[in-house]
Structures are given as structure tokens and as C-alpha cells.
Amino acid sequence: MDVLYSLSKTLKDARDKIVEGTLYSNVSDLIQQFNQMIITMNGNEFQTGGIGNLPTRNWSFDFGLLGTTLLNLDANYVETARNTIDYFVDFVDNVCMDEMVRESQRNGIAPQSESLRKLSGIKFKRINFDNSSEYIENWNLQNRRQRTGFTFHKPNIFPYSASFTLNRSQPAHDNLMGTMWLNAGSEIQVAGFDYSCAINAPANIQQFEHIVQLRRVLTTATITLLPDAERFSFPRVINSADGATTWYFNPVILRPNNVEVEFLLNGQIINTYQARFGTIVARNFDTIRLSFQLMRPPNMTPSVAALFPNAQPFEHHATVGLTLRIESAVCESVLADASETMLANVTSVRQEYAIPVGPVFPPGMNWTDLITNYSPSREDNLQRVFTVASIRSMLVK
């Protein structure tokens, strides 16, 4: 894997810097590294593909070295280099695709394609000169079963979940109280509602709670907490739990009271915030507990009192909500996030070449399914294919 990264890094630098008119002295070190790559690869043969509709291709290497010059690189020099670069780039691209479409239930962190296994041989280590990639660093750690650490921006840690619970219901669905939520990606939105605006609740206060368990532990997380849930701020028709009917939700938004968010690890509270909004941080957690209250306004103008009558019908439904968004965090496991395209890269290649469903990943690389059942085998394989996708993205956008 580290050899594949170094090949890709060398080729990217060569493609960017070996251009007509460049002083040879400015790229002499790169050309020496490029020539070392050619010397190491010459005389070797590889085969890629042969799975799904990914075609089988044979690769052989017999290229001349780039020479030295006292002046600028001319057109002939650059054309010779380009022909070599293009062949190598095509080879690396196909090795990456071949690796991205394979999976294994055992030792999925190790190379699975014959071409990458061959590149892992000791003779190719002479190419290895740059392992600065975070993915490569963590792949090497995971390969030795040492602790890894990925930094993510808006990590997709929450499987998609959209539902509701009713703490009070009537057959006519005209006086309901409960909680509804939408968890997806890096965001939780939860709303508590009471059609009667807590008129019969103790002290005219309704208490709500929403608990979310993560599939992986996050550390040093920067989080945004807002006293609102905009996705639940407009009227909607909702299917009943049994699917037999529908009920109408017509929210009027109030500010939540006594808001508390707890971050827990293995059942122990690590961080707690009360009535604090904006940016917060959490040190170490695998569970988030949100609690908040809906308080019936003690003093209301006539127009507000008309919204919340003392008896049915309740045409407007008092609602309070919270939004919690994980902006950045560190995780030992690889995740899809907002700043990278690894999941899309892997999924598109597997779809384009009609790769059959294997023993590890769900059909279509469905992320909700994958993260919901994030087994050690999936974790190993996902880290490997994401690492390869990061290497491929250096050359192929």
C-alpha cells in the first residue's frame, strides 16, 4: 500500500512539474526519483481486473530513463516523459480499481488483489520515499493492530433514523404528546410536542429525552448545539405507527427550557452542558443524551392565548426542539465525511463495473446499513478501500 502511494505521489509530482521550459535543476531530484521508479518497475509484469465487468489487463514495464540536461526541458524531453507518465498513471488507476472492488472476511486490511500483493514485495520498497498521507499512516498502524486516529469534518456517524414516539395519544389523533427526530450523517434534530401545550402536565411542564448511541467512539469533538429543530418547524401529515391512518402536525415553536446534553462513554458521563448553546466540545463519548422541557407560557397575550386554548380543539401544537451537529472529531475507525469523496469513489467504481455483492459490504455500499452493522471485518476492508481511493484521487478526479 505504501509503495502504491509513493508511485502515485511520484507520478503526480512528475505530471505537475515536468513541463516544457522548466529548468532541469529545479526538477533534478524529482527526475532521479522518477528514474528510480522506472528501474524498479522495469522487467516486471502485472495483471489487473477480471472481476465483475472490470476487464482483465496485462501490464509490462520496459521504459528508458530520463536523461540530464544543462538547460530547460524541451518539447521532446517532456513528450518522452509524458508517454511514460501516462502508462504508469493508467497502471496505478487500474491497480486501485482492482483493489477497491475486492473484499475479504479475514484480514481485510491486507491487499486483496494480486497486483497490489506483488507491489508489496521487498524489491519494490526502493520506490517508497513518502508516507505523509494520513490514510497511509493509519493503514500502517491498523495493519500492525496499533491505535489509529482519523480526523473527520462532519463525520457520517449517525445511521439514518426518522421516527416518533407518542407519550400520549388518542384514537382520533387530536391530542398527542411525544417526540419526533431525524438522525442522519453528523446531525441530530429532535422535537418535543404537546398539542395541549402542557396544560395538564405537572407545573405545566413536559419533559422530553432523546438518546443516540454511536457505532464508534468519537474523541475531541467540536459540536454545535442550537435551541431549535428547523426540520420540524412546518406543518406535515404523519403516518400513524400502525400505518392505519395519518395525523396532522401543525407546530408553533417555543424555546426549550432546562436543556441538558450529556456525552457518555460506556455508561459513564464524560461531559455535561446545561443551557449552553453554540459551540461545545466533547472529550470522549459513544452515547449522546439530550433532555429538554416544554413549558406552557405563564403569561400570554390574547393572540398567543388563542393559539393554546384550555380545551380542545387544539389546532396549533406547541413544539420545542434541539439541533446537535458534530462539526469535527477524531475516530479510530474510518468514516465517510463531508470533506472527502472516498465513499463515492469506491461506490461508483463498484457500480460502474457491476461488481457482485461480496461477503463483507452491503449491496450498493449502503452507508446506513454499513455503519449500523460496523463489524471488525467491515472496518478493516473499509479502511483498505478508502486508503486506495485516497491514492487514486491523487491522479484521477
UniProtKB/Swiss-Prot annotation:
It is found in: Virion. It holds the Pfam family Rota_Capsid_VP6. This is Intermediate capsid protein VP6. It comes from Rotavirus A (strain RVA/Human/United States/DS-1/1976/G2P1B[4]) (RV-A). One of its GO terms (molecular function) is host cell surface receptor binding. Ca(2+) binds at N266, D286. Homotrimer. Interacts with the inner capsid protein VP2. Interacts with the outer capsid glycoprotein VP7. Interacts with the outer capsid protein VP5*. Keywords: Calcium, Capsid protein, Intermediate capsid protein, Metal-binding, Ubl conjugation, Virion, Zinc. The N-terminus is blocked. Sumoylated with SUMO1 and SUMO2. Sumoylation of viral proteins seems to have a positive role on viral replication. GO terms for cellular component: viral envelope; viral intermediate capsid. Intermediate capsid protein that self assembles to form an icosahedral capsid with a T=13 symmetry, which consists of 230 trimers of VP6, with channels at each of its five-fold vertices. This capsid constitutes the middle concentric layer of the viral mature particle. The innermost VP2 capsid and the intermediate VP6 capsid remain intact following cell entry to protect the dsRNA from degradation and to prevent unfavorable antiviral responses in the host cell during all the replication cycle of the virus. One of its GO terms (biological process) is fusion of virus membrane with host plasma membrane. The VP6 trimer contains a zinc ion located at the center of the molecule. The zinc ion is not essential for either trimerization or transcription activity of the DLP. Zinc-depleted VP6 has an increased sensitivity to proteases. Gene3D superfamilies: 2.60.120.170, Viral capsid alpha domain. Zn(2+) binds at H153. Belongs to the rotavirus VP6 family. Residues 62-73 are annotated as: Interaction with the inner capsid protein VP2.
